[in-house]
Amino acid sequence: RPSFCNLPVKPGPCNGFFSAFYYSQKKNKCHSFTYGGCKGNANRFSTIEECRRTCVG
């Protein structure tokens, strides 16, 4: 799994309202969160399938 999968969820400082997914290392699963639309980090996926394929295996 790529190292960015272990980054904490980071919604970013902007006020957008975008549905996204992140990988939780603690639970070894992908969860939804609301992304603000800017900044954040690489542990952010458009679909749960993409998150699972990249980080869960």
Swiss-Prot record:
User: The organism's lineage?
Assistant: Eukaryota, Metazoa, Chordata, Craniata, Vertebrata
Keyword Metal-binding part of the UniProt annotation:
no
Which molecular-function annotations from GO does this UniProt entry contain? serine-type endopeptidase inhibitor activity; toxin activity
- Give the family per the record: Belongs to the venom Kunitz-type family.
Q: In which tissues is it expressed?
A: Expressed by the venom gland.
- Domain of life where this protein originates: Eukaryota
Q: Does the keyword Electron transport apply?
A: no
Notes on the domains? Exploits its two major loops and engages more positions in its interaction with V2R. The pharmacophore defined by numerous amino acids positioned in loop 1 (9 to 18) and loop 2 (34, 39 and 44) may be at the origin of the absolute selectivity of this protein for V2R.
Chief localization class?
Answer: secreted
Which protein, by its recorded name, is this? Mambaquaretin-3
State the disulfide connectivity: C5-C55, C14-C38, C30-C51
CC annotations in GO? extracellular space
Which keywords are on file for this protein? Disulfide bond, G-protein coupled receptor impairing toxin, Secreted, Toxin
Positions of the BPTI/Kunitz inhibitor domain: 5-55
Q: Which residues form a coiled coil?
A: none
- Where in or outside the cell is it found? Secreted
- Tell me the function of this protein: Interacts with vasopressin V2 receptor (V2R/AVPR2), probably in a selective manner. Inhibits vasopressin binding human V2R in the nanomolar range (Ki=13.3 nM), and also moderately inhibits vasopressin-induced cAMP production (IC(50)=453 nM). In vivo, intraperitoneal injection of this protein into rats increases diuresis by 4.5-fold, without any loss of electrolytes.
